[in-house]
Amino acid sequence: MKYNFDEIIDRKNAKRSYSTKWDDSARKARKYGFGETFPEDKICLQTADMDFKTAPAIIEAMKEVSEHGIYGYSAINDEYREAVCHWFSTRQNWHFNPEDIMHCNGTHPALVECIKRFTKPNEGIIVLTPSYSYHDDIENCNRIFVGVEMIEKDGYYTIDFEALEKALKNENNTLFVICHPHNPTGRVWNKEELTQMATLSRKYNVLMVSDEVHSDIIRKGITFYPMMSVVGSEGLITLTAVNKTFNLAGLSCTNIIVQDPKIKEKFNGYYSLPNPFGVAAVIAAYTESSDWVDALNEYLDETLKWCYNFINEKMPKAKCIIPEGSYVIWLDLRGYNLSDEEIKHKIINEAHLVLQGGSNFDSIYGQQFQRICIPSPRSMIQEAFERLYKVFE
């Protein structure tokens, strides 16, 4: 393979790492239930970033910025905008104009910007659950989190459109956040699902925000359809980013894509200043690193197949599916008839794994689930799953 995704890179002790995922502080140890210190042999698979070096072209571009020696106020230029348009037109057959792009320093800030501009305090924000951590963003804006529980069968999730319509019909609910691909279930919404969500949202005049930051991480044989390319731009904002695709979350480069003139008008006065490393990274990612993403997806596909087979063969009481998109496994441990606390004890105190408990995604129906982020060298993932097997079987 041209790129070495098997390389083990020290993110815990490296002088310039600054990794929150591998942070060894007492504060982080307490947060995850380890007491005051982490065990030396911990394996961290709780955060949706990768333990792989980013694409070589991106590293070289940032070296050039570093050598320039001036890191002043920066802006996204024509080259940046054209690079974004090029990527989505060639990779996802989604066409929009350079002037439809607004930069934001991160996906959470982008969502918060949308919430504050288009909703009022105490209004409801609809989210399909189990859900990625939009909860804090919504409540910190003094809005109400309105969860719509999805239907689960053998690990596969579908939308309960009857429940969704009931939520959309409530006049106090004014915004619908759609995670596509869905985190943590791994669903990639098909054209029919996207169309039905949009039709219902427009029927009840509810603005849609489609979070598509995982959209480049798609299984072989699965087609990702950008929501805006399927349903049109009316009443829809899309968020995209290089962070998940290229392991660049620390550069905080999210794009807000808006084509609807009425929505654009409400963004009048908005501005966001990127850092120069982020601008260079986005351009290099979207114009020189397509083959790296293809190789990454092949590697992740093989890792996910290995994980799925391991669970089926060695831990038959557990359930998971290979996600259609993203690089997270939503592991169902209900078959062991253990409480959520007992499951956490085994994972933390016996297996020495740092995972993310399902209750973070759904306080009721997420109990006895764990989210596992697998974009790490396969040997690390295999060791983590062997530990799970030892403590549960």
Residue ranges and their predicted role:
Residues 2-5, 9-106, 287-288:
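N-terminal small-domain helix-loop-helix segment of the aminotransferase-like
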Residues 71-199, 216-217, 222-230, 237:
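Conserved core of the PLP fold type I
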Residues 76, 235-313, 319-323:
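PLP-dependent aminotransferase class I/II
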Residues 142, 203-204, 234, 351:
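Helix C-cap/helix->beta junction micro-motif
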Residues 212:
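Walker B catalytic acidic pair
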Residues 221-243, 262-266, 353, 370-371:
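Conserved active-site segment immediately N-terminal to the catalytic lysine
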Residues 300-301, 314-350:
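Conserved PLP-binding catalytic core of the aspartate aminotransferase-like
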Residues 346-354, 361-393:
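PLP-dependent enzyme catalytic core of the Aspartate aminotransferase-like
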